[in-house]
Amino acid sequence: MKPAVEGIMYPIGAKAELSSSLPPVSGHRFEGPYMEVPHAAWSRCKSVLDKAFYFETDPNVAQVFVLAPLHKGTVCLDETNAVYAPEDGELAGSDWKISLQTPPVIAGLISFSDDICSEESSLEIIAPYLSVRFPNARVCWLLATPESRNVKRIVEIIVKDFPFSPIFISNNMETGCAAMWKEALRP
Protein backbone atom coordinates (compact mmCIF):
# COMPACT_ATOMS: atom_id res chain seq x y z
CA MET A 1 0.00 0.00 0.00
CA LYS A 2 1.13 3.52 -0.69
CA PRO A 3 0.93 6.21 1.97
CA ALA A 4 -1.98 8.57 1.45
CA VAL A 5 -1.52 11.25 4.11
CA GLU A 6 2.27 11.68 4.43
CA GLY A 7 3.03 15.39 4.48
CA ILE A 8 -0.58 16.09 5.46
CA MET A 9 -1.39 14.20 8.68
CA TYR A 10 2.27 13.71 9.64
CA PRO A 11 5.55 15.06 8.23
CA ILE A 12 7.71 13.66 5.46
CA GLY A 13 10.74 12.18 7.22
CA ALA A 14 8.67 11.20 10.27
CA LYS A 15 10.90 8.28 11.31
CA ALA A 16 13.99 10.50 11.40
CA GLU A 17 12.07 13.00 13.52
CA LEU A 18 10.94 10.26 15.91
CA SER A 19 14.35 8.59 16.06
CA SER A 20 15.84 11.85 17.30
CA SER A 21 12.97 12.93 19.57
CA LEU A 22 11.55 9.67 20.94
CA PRO A 23 14.01 8.59 23.62
CA PRO A 24 15.10 5.00 24.13
CA VAL A 25 13.06 3.79 27.06
CA SER A 26 13.87 1.31 29.78
CA GLY A 27 11.74 0.34 32.71
CA HIS A 28 8.41 1.34 31.15
CA ARG A 29 6.54 -1.69 29.88
CA PHE A 30 3.61 -1.92 27.48
CA GLU A 31 0.62 -2.29 29.76
CA GLY A 32 -2.00 -4.58 28.23
CA PRO A 33 -4.39 -5.71 27.14
CA TYR A 34 -4.32 -2.79 24.70
CA MET A 35 -3.13 0.77 24.20
CA GLU A 36 -5.51 3.40 22.89
CA VAL A 37 -4.03 5.83 20.35
CA PRO A 38 -5.68 8.78 18.60
CA HIS A 39 -6.15 9.03 14.86
CA ALA A 40 -5.71 12.67 14.07
CA ALA A 41 -3.04 14.82 12.47
CA TRP A 42 0.24 14.99 14.35
CA SER A 43 -0.33 18.74 14.75
CA ARG A 44 -3.25 17.82 17.02
CA CYS A 45 -2.07 14.64 18.75
CA LYS A 46 1.72 14.16 18.53
CA SER A 47 2.27 14.73 22.25
CA VAL A 48 -0.39 12.09 23.01
CA LEU A 49 1.23 9.67 20.55
CA ASP A 50 4.68 10.32 22.05
CA LYS A 51 3.29 9.40 25.49
CA ALA A 52 1.49 6.36 24.10
CA PHE A 53 4.72 5.03 22.57
CA TYR A 54 6.85 5.85 25.61
CA PHE A 55 7.60 2.27 26.61
CA GLU A 56 10.39 -0.23 26.32
CA THR A 57 9.93 -2.58 23.41
CA ASP A 58 11.09 -6.08 22.82
CA PRO A 59 12.86 -6.29 19.44
CA ASN A 60 11.66 -9.89 19.22
CA VAL A 61 7.96 -8.91 19.05
CA ALA A 62 6.77 -10.72 15.93
CA GLN A 63 3.18 -9.45 15.60
CA VAL A 64 1.43 -6.16 16.38
CA PHE A 65 -2.30 -5.54 15.99
CA VAL A 66 -3.89 -2.20 15.13
CA LEU A 67 -7.68 -2.22 15.49
CA ALA A 68 -9.52 0.75 14.01
CA PRO A 69 -12.92 1.99 12.92
CA LEU A 70 -14.01 1.92 9.30
CA HIS A 71 -15.48 5.34 8.58
CA LYS A 72 -16.03 5.15 4.84
CA GLY A 73 -18.43 2.21 4.77
CA THR A 74 -18.36 -1.03 2.84
CA VAL A 75 -18.23 -1.76 -0.87
CA CYS A 76 -21.43 -3.76 -1.27
CA LEU A 77 -24.47 -4.67 0.78
CA ASP A 78 -23.49 -8.28 1.46
CA GLU A 79 -20.33 -7.03 3.19
CA THR A 80 -22.06 -4.72 5.66
CA ASN A 81 -20.82 -6.85 8.57
CA ALA A 82 -17.28 -7.33 7.29
CA VAL A 83 -14.02 -6.60 9.01
CA TYR A 84 -11.41 -5.36 6.53
CA ALA A 85 -7.63 -5.67 6.26
CA PRO A 86 -5.20 -4.64 3.53
CA GLU A 87 -3.55 -7.30 1.39
CA ASP A 88 -0.31 -8.63 2.86
CA GLY A 89 2.68 -6.55 1.79
CA GLU A 90 4.08 -3.34 3.17
CA LEU A 91 3.11 0.22 3.87
CA ALA A 92 6.04 2.58 3.32
CA GLY A 93 6.63 6.29 3.67
CA SER A 94 9.59 8.44 2.76
CA ASP A 95 11.84 7.01 5.49
CA TRP A 96 9.86 4.22 7.18
CA LYS A 97 8.14 0.97 6.30
CA ILE A 98 6.13 -1.65 8.10
CA SER A 99 5.28 -5.18 7.06
CA LEU A 100 1.53 -5.82 6.73
CA GLN A 101 0.41 -9.36 7.42
CA THR A 102 -2.85 -10.83 8.64
CA PRO A 103 -2.32 -14.08 10.55
CA PRO A 104 -3.86 -17.07 8.74
CA VAL A 105 -5.87 -18.00 11.84
CA ILE A 106 -8.11 -14.92 11.37
CA ALA A 107 -7.85 -14.48 7.58
CA GLY A 108 -11.08 -16.42 6.97
CA LEU A 109 -13.03 -13.88 9.06
CA ILE A 110 -11.81 -10.84 7.13
CA SER A 111 -12.40 -9.19 3.75
CA PHE A 112 -9.21 -7.94 2.11
CA SER A 113 -9.23 -4.61 0.26
CA ASP A 114 -6.35 -2.20 -0.26
CA ASP A 115 -8.83 0.25 -1.79
CA ILE A 116 -11.03 0.46 1.31
CA CYS A 117 -8.08 0.48 3.71
CA SER A 118 -6.22 3.20 1.81
CA GLU A 119 -9.12 5.57 2.50
CA GLU A 120 -8.49 5.33 6.26
CA SER A 121 -5.45 6.93 7.90
CA SER A 122 -5.51 5.33 11.37
CA LEU A 123 -2.57 3.00 10.69
CA GLU A 124 -0.54 5.41 8.61
CA ILE A 125 -0.53 8.04 11.38
CA ILE A 126 1.10 5.61 13.85
CA ALA A 127 3.16 3.63 11.31
CA PRO A 128 6.30 5.75 11.80
CA TYR A 129 6.07 5.02 15.56
CA LEU A 130 5.61 1.30 14.87
CA SER A 131 8.65 1.32 12.57
CA VAL A 132 10.77 2.80 15.38
CA ARG A 133 9.43 0.74 18.29
CA PHE A 134 8.74 -2.57 16.49
CA PRO A 135 11.12 -2.60 13.50
CA ASN A 136 10.90 -6.37 12.93
CA ALA A 137 7.21 -6.94 13.63
CA ARG A 138 4.43 -7.79 11.22
CA VAL A 139 1.45 -5.48 11.59
CA CYS A 140 -2.13 -6.70 11.30
CA TRP A 141 -4.43 -3.73 10.68
CA LEU A 142 -8.14 -4.44 11.02
CA LEU A 143 -10.97 -2.03 10.23
CA ALA A 144 -14.57 -2.53 11.34
CA THR A 145 -17.87 -0.72 11.64
CA PRO A 146 -19.92 -0.91 14.85
CA GLU A 147 -22.17 -3.43 13.07
CA SER A 148 -19.35 -5.81 12.12
CA ARG A 149 -20.30 -9.21 13.50
CA ASN A 150 -16.85 -10.80 13.52
CA VAL A 151 -15.20 -8.28 15.86
CA LYS A 152 -15.73 -10.32 19.05
CA ARG A 153 -14.59 -13.59 17.46
CA ILE A 154 -11.48 -11.98 15.95
CA VAL A 155 -10.53 -10.42 19.29
CA GLU A 156 -10.99 -13.76 21.06
CA ILE A 157 -8.57 -15.38 18.60
CA ILE A 158 -6.02 -12.55 18.91
CA VAL A 159 -6.05 -12.70 22.72
CA LYS A 160 -5.82 -16.51 22.78
CA ASP A 161 -3.28 -17.08 20.00
CA PHE A 162 -1.15 -13.93 20.40
CA PRO A 163 -1.06 -13.26 24.16
CA PHE A 164 2.19 -11.26 24.03
CA SER A 165 1.46 -9.20 20.94
CA PRO A 166 0.79 -5.49 21.49
CA ILE A 167 -2.69 -4.33 20.52
CA PHE A 168 -3.35 -0.71 19.61
CA ILE A 169 -6.87 0.65 19.27
CA SER A 170 -7.01 3.71 17.05
CA ASN A 171 -9.84 5.77 18.47
CA ASN A 172 -11.15 9.30 18.24
CA MET A 173 -11.30 10.23 21.92
CA GLU A 174 -14.20 12.62 21.33
CA THR A 175 -16.46 10.34 19.28
CA GLY A 176 -15.40 6.92 20.58
CA CYS A 177 -15.62 5.51 17.05
CA ALA A 178 -13.61 2.39 17.96
CA ALA A 179 -15.89 1.43 20.86
CA MET A 180 -16.68 -1.95 19.27
CA TRP A 181 -13.02 -3.01 19.56
CA LYS A 182 -12.78 -1.79 23.17
CA GLU A 183 -16.00 -3.62 24.07
CA ALA A 184 -14.73 -6.83 22.48
CA LEU A 185 -11.50 -6.61 24.52
CA ARG A 186 -13.29 -6.26 27.85
CA PRO A 187 -12.84 -9.39 29.98
Where are these regions (language model features)?
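Active-site histidine-anchored catalytic micro-motif
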Residues: 1-187
